[in-house]
């Protein structure tokens, strides 16, 4: 039947009306959007200096440092590094290998800096702040066409630390990448920080006044927004 054959051919060749929307994922993570923007993950050519001790290798040491900054009672006036590491191991927050991999000099430098002083004296501190918000696909840089640019998409993630200062929020993102300057971190992760800003402002209904990257490798910081 030629008529039937014609209709089948037309159906096969006809583009699905909502094909552009089908290409949009149901959810994204803030970190994956950052990697998509650069086209690859940030490459660590050599191990950061603070990762040169202990038996843990590679990204696991970076994870250990993030876990330490998440759970350690670093804002206590009676903070003691040795005692705190023992407590974290005893309570299961860190393994002994992770505790051994923490560079005490890097922690000391961070805690003696201006950023830490601001965090400690702030009105409120939120560590490892988890969020789940809706954003337009254009912010996630995955919009297929102009028609889908404003289509909402679910985004989730976690902010290393945020604190409230003078009624506004400040976001702090710790990075362990081996780099020559904090400017290179800003280039690679600026989009991620802007997504964090959007998420925190939605979740807490508060203005974010600053987004800061702190390099544990260099002991330096750079403001993104």
Residue ranges of predicted features:
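Structural signature of nuclease core domains in nucleic-acid processing machines
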Residues: 1-225
């Amino acid at each position: 039947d030629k008529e039937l054959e014609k209709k089948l051919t037309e159906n096969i060749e006809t583009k699905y009306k909502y094909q552009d929307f089908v290409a949009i994922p149901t959810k994204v993570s803030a970190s994956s959007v950052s990697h998509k923007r650069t086209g690859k993950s940030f490459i660590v050519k050599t191990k950061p200096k603070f990762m040169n001790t202990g038996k843990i290798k590679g990204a696991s040491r970076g994870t250990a440092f993030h876990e330490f900054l998440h759970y350690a009672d670093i804002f206590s006036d009676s903070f003691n590094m040795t005692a705190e590491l023992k407590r974290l191991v005893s309570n299961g927050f860190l393994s002994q290998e992770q505790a051994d991999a923490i560079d005490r000099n890097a922690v000391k430098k961070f805690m003696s800096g201006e950023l830490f002083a601001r965090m400690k004296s702030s009105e409120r501190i939120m560590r490892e702040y988890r969020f789940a918000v809706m954003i337009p696909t254009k912010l996630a840089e995955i919009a297929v066409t102009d028609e889908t640019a404003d289509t909402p998409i679910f985004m989730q993630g976690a902010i290393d630390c945020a604190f409230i200062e003078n009624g506004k929020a400040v976001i702090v993102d710790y990075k362990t990448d081996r780099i020559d300057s904090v400017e290179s971190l800003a280039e690679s992760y600026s989009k991620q920080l802007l997504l964090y800003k959007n998420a925190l402002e939605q979740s807490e209904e508060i203005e974010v006044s600053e987004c800061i990257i702190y390099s544990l490798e260099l002991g330096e910081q750079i403001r993104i927004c």
